[in-house]
A protein has these predicted regions:
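N-terminal capping/lid subdomain adjacent to the active-site entrance of alpha/beta enzymes
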Residues: 1-105
Length: 105
């Protein structure tokens, strides 16, 4: 299985305002797991001040996972993203044709 990571910074339509402050952007990590022409996708988007890991910790955990994809990351957001990519890959493999890599959102 080959795994690719891509980081993005997305602009929110409206500022997200919490007791911790406000933000107009979210940083995300997109994951693509590929094997035999099939692809699965996952995403990690830890929000500062919420959750158990920072964006940097999640990215580091996923970068380590890319080196050893047989062991899921311990960091919760990274683990969920990796598990989602693997599950989507398994679902794609059980379908009749390889995926195009495009996702309807």
């Amino acid at each position: 299985m080959l795994v690719a990571l891509e980081t993005r910074k997305l602009r929110l339509r409206h500022p997200l305002v919490t007791a911790h402050g406000s933000t107009t952007h979210r940083k995300i990590i997109e994951i693509t797991a590929a094997e035999d022409g099939f692809q699965g996708h996952g995403e990690a988007a830890p929000l500062p001040g919420f959750g158990l890991e920072t964006f940097s910790e999640s990215l580091t955990a996923l970068q380590n996972w890319v080196k050893n994809p047989n062991r899921l990351p311990d960091a919760p957001a990274a683990r969920s993203a990796a598990a989602t990519a693997i599950e989507n890959l398994e679902k794609a493999r059980s379908s009749s044709a390889p995926t195009s890599g495009k996702i309807a959102v």
